Amino acid sequence: PRQLSLELYGRIPTVEEYERLHGLEDVSEAIIDEMIGSSEFYDQLRRYHRSLLWSNLGDNDLVGQTVERSRDENFDVWLNRQKRDEYRGRDVDCLDMEHTNFDADGRPLAMIENYQEGDCAGGEGCTMDGWVQVQPYWAPGTTIRVCAFDAQPHTDGTPRDNGDPRTCDQSGNDDPLCGCGPNLRYCTARGANYDAVHEALLEEPARIFEEVIAAGEPYMNAFATRATAMNGALAHFYRYLSDDNDAELKNAPELAYDADWQLVERESYHSGILTTLGFLRRFASHRARVNRLYTAFLCDPFEAPSGGLPPATDDCSLNPDLSARCGCASCHETIEPATTHWGRWEEGDDFVYLESIDTFNNNCANCEKGQCSNYCKTFYITRELETTPGSVDTELGKLKTLGWRTEEEVAALEAGPSALVSRPEYQQQLASCAVRNFSERVFGRELTAEERTSWLVDKTASFEANGHDFLAMVKDVVTDDRYRRIE
C-alpha cells in the first residue's frame, strides 16, 4: 500500500489508510478503483504530465504591464514603475494625498505642476498625482490605493497623429492617457496575482490531459482536441493581459477571477496540448517542439550518429538542407518535415497563429546576399543561407519551414500538429510510449530490452483494446505482478 500510495497519490499512506488495509493480504481491486478515481490521483496525474512536458516558463514577463506595491512606514500605494517617467516627467512615485483633480471625463489632472521636491528638483520639476481607491480585479470586494495616473480606467488614449483613435490595452501604448484600465484589468500585480497567472499557464496542458482522461476519451485526443481548460486567472490573462496573443483566445470567457477550471472551446486550428501557450513558449522553436513531442510522447529521442559529424570541410557538410546534410540527416530527415506542422505558429515568445501567410516572397527571393531585410532573413529562404554557389537556388523565396519539402510535406502547413500525431504509425507509437512512460515511472527503472519486446507489446495491445483509456492502463500496470514484486 505504501508504494501504491506514493505512485497514485504522491504521498505515503495515512494512519487511517494503513489501518484499513491491516490484515488484508493484498490491496483489493475495489480499493485500487477508488484510488484511481480520487481527486488526489488526478492531482498526481497532472504533476506526472507536467514532468513529461518539462513545464517551466522561467521568470519571463508574460504581460505588457505590471503594477507593484510600494510601501514604507508612512505610505502604501500601488503603481506601474514602467511608466513613472512617462506620467510624471521623472522616475518618481505619486504623492501621499487623495487625488481630487479630474476633468469632465473623469481623467486625472495634475495635483501639482512643476513639483520641485526631492528627485523632482530642478528644471521643469514633476507633474504630480495623488492616489485613488480601486477595487482590483484579482481581489473583488477589496480596495487598494493606486496612483491616479496609473489607475486611469479609460480605454481610449491620445489620438494618433493622423487623427485615428488609440485604444488603451495591456501594452500601455507609451501613452500617458492610458492606465491599467477598469479595475486595473490591463495590468498584472507582482506579489498578488502574477504567480497565479504563471502557474495557470503551466497547468493548462496538464488540465487538457486530465479532462481527456477523466472523460474516458482516447489518450491521443489530448494532442488533437480543440478544447482547453481555463480558470479565472487564465481567462483574464488571455482576454486582457497577454501582450502577443492573436490565437483567438482574446475571446476567452469572462469568468470570475477565482473561478475554477472549466473546458473552453478554441478555434479549429488548435491541436490539444501542442498549441497551448505554455507548450509553445516553453519550446519556442519548431524544432524544439518536434523534439519534445518525439522524446516525451513517442519515446523516440533524437541522437547524434555514433560515428560523429564529418569534417566541416566535407562538401556534404555544406548542404543548406539539414535533412540531407551529412551528420545531420539521421535526425533532421524526420525533424524538418515535422516542423512544417507548426509552420503557421510563430516561433519565439509570441502566441500567434498566422491565418494569412505568404508561402513565397518575391522580394526575399531576389535580394542579394548581404542586402536582404531582417524580415526576409527571419522567415524566408534567401541567399544569406547560401553555403556554396547555387546551393539555395531552387528554394529562394520559400517560407523557411517549406524549404526542400515535398508536396505532401508542404500540405502539413495547413494540417497542423494534430495531423502529425494522427498518423496510424504514430498512434501506435503514442500508445506504446504512454504505457512505457507510466510503467517506468511506477517501476522506478527503465524497462529492459526483453520487457520492451514482450511485456510492453502485450500491455500496449491491452491499452489499444480498451480504446486507449489511460485509467484502464494505469490499473493494468499497477495490478501486474511486475509492479507487485517491487520491494
Residue ranges: model-predicted function:
Residues L8, I12-R445, A449-E487:
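Active-site substrate-binding loop specific to GH73 endo-beta-N-acetylglucosaminidase modules
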Residues P1-Y9:
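Post-BTB helical module
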